[in-house]
Amino acid sequence: MTDFGGEDLFGRGDYSFWSRLFRPASESLVEAAAISVGARVLDVAAGDGNTAIAAANVGANVTAVDPSPAQIERGRHRSEGSPVRWVLALGERLPFADGSFDHALDTFGDNLDEPTARPALEEMARVVRRGGVIGFTRWTREGFNRDWAELEERFLTGGSEGSSSPLLGTEPTVTAAVAPFSTDVEIIRQTLSIAWSSADSFTDALIAQDPYLHDLHRQLPPTRWGAFTDELRGLVHKWNSHATGGLRLEFPYLRVVVKTLPDGHGGGR
């Protein structure tokens, strides 16, 4: 992600590769958060608009924020004709008053990774009215998710294994993180299933289009990059559950819906 002074990560690659695949998770989160006509909804780390558009489609008044100018541009184009307002902002420094929204959502946003997870979550709680709803999705460290994360960490750190779990990647850590502003938390384990024509064609598309891999490619010398892509291809084959030559990959994640305390964190109307 950009820091408003550096290069925009999402100006490289093609994030729509993932956006198309993640759309069911956005629709599931909007439904679980019980968003209705006229609700004031904030989509944090909105990317190119999956969750914002899903909320607008049920009649909500949506504000979408993202720190990437490229994503903002894509999102505005995708949501043209929908009641979505786009704002360039960091998820951990939201430019809104306390209690400005009924719902704040975040679908796989980088802002809920370390080191910004806690301040980003606190900001979502701050801008939601008392008794409002926070909803987010987070990957778990299981299966292909775990192996891919550890592969990237190993190559970025020069050989040491990465084994730590993300702050919001398990039910206990999520419950602890939201405890300051809620005791009403629903955590549901879900799985995104991705289908493709073959494991190799998926890996080729992933390498060619994923913005994070574009960034990793720039950081690694050619021999290390070649070794990384070979191992990544092996992981895709390892976790492919399709039996007849196609690809089926499963990405487990947590869908979290939090109802904030009536007298808790944040402002009010």
Label each residue range with its predicted role.
Residues 118, 125, 129-198:
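Conserved catalytic/acceptor-binding region of the Class I
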Residues 4, 22, 48, 168, ...:
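Conserved Class I S-adenosyl-L-methionine
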Residues 102-117:
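A short SAM/SAH-binding and catalytic strip from SAM-dependent methyltransferases
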Residues 1-39, 50-54, 71-74, 78, ...:
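Conserved class I S-adenosyl-L-methionine
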Residues 92-104:
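A short acidic, Gly/Pro-enriched loop at the edge of an enzyme's catalytic core
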Residues 34-36, 57, 80, 129, ...:
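Short conserved AdoMet
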